[in-house]
Amino acid sequence: MEASSPLDPVGRLVAFCRGGVHLAVLLLFLSPSTLGQCPAPPLFPYAKPINPTDESTFPVGTSLKYECRPGYIKRQFSITCEVNSVWTSPQDVCIRKQCETPLDPQNGIVHVNTDIRFGSSITYTCNEGYRLIGSSSAMCIISDQSVAWDAEAPICESIPCEIPPSIPNGDFFSPNREDFHYGMVVTYQCNTDARGKKLFNLVGEPSIHCTSIDGQVGVWSGPPPQCIELNKCTPPHVENAVIVSKNKSLFSLRDMVEFRCQDGFMMKGDSSVYCRSLNRWEPQLPSCFKVKSCGAFLGELPNGHVFVPQNLQLGAKVTFVCNTGYQLKGNSSSHCVLDGVESIWNSSVPVCEQVICKLPQDMSGFQKGLQMKKDYYYGDNVALECEDGYTLEGSSQSQCQSDASWDPPLPKCVSQVICKLPQDMSGFQKGLQMKKDYYYGDNVALECEDGYTLEGSSQSQCQSDASWDPPLPKCVSRSNSGLIAGIFIGIIVLILFIIFSYWMIMKFKKRNSTNEKCKEVGIYLNSKEDSCVQPQSLLTSQENNSTSSPARNSLTQEV
């Protein structure tokens, strides 16, 4: 390979041409400032160019002349494009012309916001009790070749009021009864008789004055008083309360008025008042004060949620809800209630306890070797199987639910014991739905046919030992039952007859034996006592009773 030799003159010329092309392309993309030019000059709100132009670029050193716009003191100035492609900035070249100094209107004030030069504004206000007639503001504007205010100064006029309202049985007094303006006071009085005796009570403020709410229209400071007949009362007024009893324009002595506070307010004092003399209400009128809202509910509920309403006023309700798998222990809500004059929450935060499902205590029939727990929680599963000799009724798999129940319900292990009905079913109704075999827990209902009597319970259940509880009944023929009853009664009568006969025989034998003994000893028999007595005593007894009837049942025996 040969080493490269220096460029010959032709090569140097080619390289130079290529470099020139590159430079030309680069110059095409350079900004005007790089080439020594200024962009279009800025617009001035206070001046305009003397010779307007549509050029967008200007070479360095170009000067443009401007003159002040109307409203400004006329003066020419110029700006120049500097070498850094920036226009020079004019300062304090156009000064705004000044309007005449405004004067305060009578009974008013003028307010100069900034100054009184071209473009500035001023405002007018009236003194208290006066209203503004005309424009409330003015601006310094161009007027012909000068500047002037665009509106004349307004007038401040005294605020007028209408004629005071008249009242029955009275009148107002004022120095002027035709012209009423702001600040004037009128006083009311009630009529009297020819001798000046008082006939009415003046109820309310005796004097009212002319005032204004909006500074334009005059109004009286309050309602006029009333001239009320003696021993009458005007309707009482309680702020934030309503009258629930019958309302009237006038109340007589001892009339009652009952109040109720509006929602959100609590009453302090008696709700009922009575009309007394001199337009007095007794006891003192109540007051209705605004009930404060309950404070923010700050309690938290682990494993649950607390739902708090936006409005925490009286009656607001906070609700507690446990997460799935937990059950609420305590109140499910708390209410904002009144405690004296304070608003409080009436319940604290409850507790969310984990749901526990339990197996039944009686697990007879289930396999003992199964892995069973004492407590099962929400979502836990249990599998149950029966021992030999038992049949599983239900699903062998069950899951603990959020309400502590099992789904599907826990199965049962039913013994395979079979209870049978007796072979002799004579006397029982043939149309009964009876099965051949009954299993543990099955029930049977039996009834007898006509002519038979059911002895025992008509309902019976198959037990785990293949017996019936209560025992199965019997159907006994009614004829047999009558015969048995007759025999039973005859036996009872016979037994009673034998007992009575035996008693009579024994009594007769005892009396005969006593008589024989009395004969042997020569004494008398006393039939009342079935005993022997001495003859002398018996004789004495007979003599004493000679006036009466002879002794009954006495026997004598000669010796």
From Swiss-Prot:
UniProt GO BP: cellular response to hypoxia; complement activation; complement activation, classical pathway; female pregnancy; in utero embryonic development; innate immune response; negative regulation of complement activation; negative regulation of complement activation, classical pathway
Gene3D superfamilies: Complement Module, domain 1
Segments in the Extracellular topological domain: 36-482
TM region(s), chain numbering: 483-503
Localization per record: Membrane
Modified residues (Phosphoserine): 527, 531, 537, 554
Residues with PTM Phosphothreonine: 540
Glycosylation-annotated residues: 53, 331
Secreted keyword on record: no
Cleavable signal peptide: 1-35
Disulfide bond residue pairs: 38-81, 68-94, 99-140, 126-156, 161-210, 190-227, 233-275, 261-288, 294-336, 322-352, 357-400, 386-413, 419-462, 448-475
Membrane topology category: Single-pass type I membrane protein
One GO CC term, this protein: receptor complex
Sushi domain span: 36-96, 97-158, 159-229, 231-290, 292-354, 355-415, 417-477
Keywords: Complement pathway, Developmental protein, Disulfide bond, Glycoprotein, Immunity, Innate immunity, Membrane, Phosphoprotein, Pregnancy, Receptor, Repeat, Signal, Sushi, Transmembrane, Transmembrane helix
InterPro entries per UniProt: SEZ6_CSMD_C4BPB_Regulators, Sushi/SCR/CCP_sf, Sushi_SCR_CCP_dom
Cytoplasmic side: 504-559
Residue ranges, annotated region (Disordered): 535-559
Family to which this protein belongs: Belongs to the receptors of complement activation (RCA) family.
Record's function text: Acts as a cofactor for complement factor I, a serine protease which protects autologous cells against complement-mediated injury by cleaving C3b and C4b deposited on host tissue. Also acts as a decay-accelerating factor, preventing the formation of C4b2a and C3bBb, the amplification convertases of the complement cascade. Seems to act as a costimulatory factor for T-cells. May play a crucial role in early embryonic development by maintaining fetomaternal tolerance.
Protein name: Complement component receptor 1-like protein
Gene (name only): Cr1l
